[in-house]
Regions:
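Long insertion/accessory domains within large nucleic-acid-processing enzymes
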Residues: 1-498
């Protein structure tokens, strides 16, 4: 009808931008049916009335079943321009259809460490676990994916990603020659300090705004704007470009960190390590250790605890871990955060590793893989259903699946799987008829796979016969032969007479 061809141009090719669904025509095409021998009467009628329009069949290119999308490209290849077209092809049309999909349960995703997995659930953002500052996490990975594969790289990437996002740098770590665990620990320490400084600056900003009465809370967009106004006021006479500060969040965070460290009695130049600082390689290790020590000291102070800074770094770490066990607050340098349940708002009983990781969507989408079959094509050799979605095939019920049914003791289900649902040709037809006519299903027969096995054995020169429960013998020759066993005593072979 007109609806089916409304998006086709004068050549019968679909236009770019058209929305298409299952069975939509992409390229209109008709093929004449084979000319049959005409009767004398038909020849007379054709001679009188002229050549009638011959019978044609519709052979249009259509969208496959279950597919949809928008046409993004159409290419037409002709023999004049493309001499490498197949023999007998004058014109070829290639239509590209694209579709946008959201991630859904069953889609496959993977990181860069072989940590692939399948999405098990997609939930509203308000139900996702969230950090203390209210930010929800994007994706939750099962921790069992780490000890089994022992790919610790994904944890280190998460830690370094968190530090890089907090401090505003880009990490480039070649395989086997990237950041060491000590360097990542130092960056996590600096990340905690800049985040803590930003939090403290926010508290001070609101106190200052409250005292000067220059702004009302309604005038400000959020905490971020309050911090920037406060920093611009405090740093106005220090030679810093206030205009640049207001437009550059990263610069503002770094200035807040420097201010906070000075207020706490530390020299920022001995702790921070931003890319533009160009710290010599020989001094980086000492700079990193100072950063870790300062972080642990400031973290302990924020919890009302004291650390002895004269201890070695290893002893300092152990003391910090003891504080963590007492208070339930994770040490900043281990890369874990306090998470809260999205539904209840309660803290989880253990700190959780949170960070930034590259995660990719693989080209194994559940929408392409979902498939169902009632009856369909069968293999000519085995008489079993074909395999795969493309052939409209069945699901393979393999050896291990058979073990599972055996373990459950599901004898009748297993018998069905191996006979009428598979390659018992007579049995599946009889079962179908019984279901349609609402009659009892008969006992299954012999699977075709057994007959194939018998033929293989016969090719080796081995004669095979089946003896049924009722004593009936089935021999497999050119035509399968059924007969009664007349002498069940076994004294004489009934085939050769008495």
């Amino acid at each position: 009808g007109d609806e089916a061809i409304r998006n086709l141009d004068e050549n019968g090719i679909i236009r770019i931008g058209a929305e298409v669904g299952p069975e939509s025509i992409l390229v209109g095409k008709i093929t004449p049916k084979g000319e049959k021998e005409l009767t004398p009467e038909e020849r007379l009628l054709r001679a009188i009335f002229g050549e009638k329009s011959r019978d044609v069949k519709d052979t249009s290119l259509k969208m496959p079943h279950g597919e949809r999308g928008i046409v993004v490209d159409v290419k037409v290849f002709t023999r004049e321009e493309n001499a490498d077209l197949s023999a007998g092809v004058d014109k070829m049309v290639r239509v590209s259809v694209a579709q946008r999909r959201k991630v859904m349960a069953g889609d496959k995703m993977a990181g860069r460490h072989g940590n692939k997995g399948v999405v098990s659930m997609v939930v509203p953002v308000e139900n996702m676990p969230f950090l203390e500052d209210g930010r929800p996490v994007d994706i939750i990975l099962n921790p069992l994916g780490i000890p089994g594969r022992m790919n610790i790289g994904q944890v280190l990437e998460t830690h370094l990603g968190w530090a890089a996002e907090s401090l505003g740098f880009r990490a480039i770590t070649p395989v086997f020659d990237g950041a060491t665990e000590e360097e990542i620990e130092a960056e996590l320490a600096r990340a905690w300090m800049i985040n803590e400084a930003w939090r403290v600056t926010g508290d001070k900003a609101w106190e200052w705004l409250e005292s000067v009465k220059a702004y009302s809370a309604e005038d400000l967009k959020d905490d971020e704007e309050a911090r920037l106004i406060y920093l611009a006021n405090v740093l106005a006479n220090t030679g810093i470009d206030v205009q640049e500060l207001m437009g550059n969040r990263l610069l503002a965070r770094r200035q807040a960190m420097n201010m906070w460290l000075k207020a706490e009695g530390y020299d920022p130049a001995l702790i921070t390590a931003f890319p533009e600082d160009n710290i010599p390689v020989s001094e980086r290790s000492a700079q990193d250790e100072r950063a870790v020590r300062a972080c642990l000291d400031l973290w302990a102070n924020s919890l009302g605890k004291e650390l002895d800074l004269n201890q070695s770094l290893e002893e300092l770490r152990k003391a910090a871990q003891q504080i963590m066990l007492e208070t339930g607050n994770p040490v900043p340098t281990i890369g874990k955060q306090i998470l809260r349940d999205g539904k209840t708002g309660d803290r989880y009983d253990q700190p959780v590793t949170v960070g930034y990781m590259t995660f990719m969507k693989l080209h194994h989408l559940v929408e392409d893989k979902v498939h169902a079959r009632a009856t369909g094509p069968y293999s000519l050799v085995t008489q079993q259903p074909l395999g795969g979605k493309a052939q409209f095939g069945g699901q393979r019920f393999g050896e291990m699946e058979v073990w599972a049914l055996e373990a459950y003791g599901a004898a009748y289900t297993l018998q069905e799987m191996l006979t009428v649902k598979s390659d018992d040709v007579v049995g599946r037809e009889a079962t179908y008829q019984a279901i349609v006519t609402n009659k009892p299903i008969e006992a299954p027969g012999t699977p075709a796979a057994f007959k194939v096995l018998v033929k293989e054995l016969q090719s080796l020169g081995l004669a095979v016969e089946s003896i049924m429960e009722d004593g009936e013998i089935i021999s497999y020759g050119k035509e399968s032969d059924r007969r009664d066993n007349r002498m069940p005593t076994g004294l004489l072979d009934s085939r050769y007479g008495a």
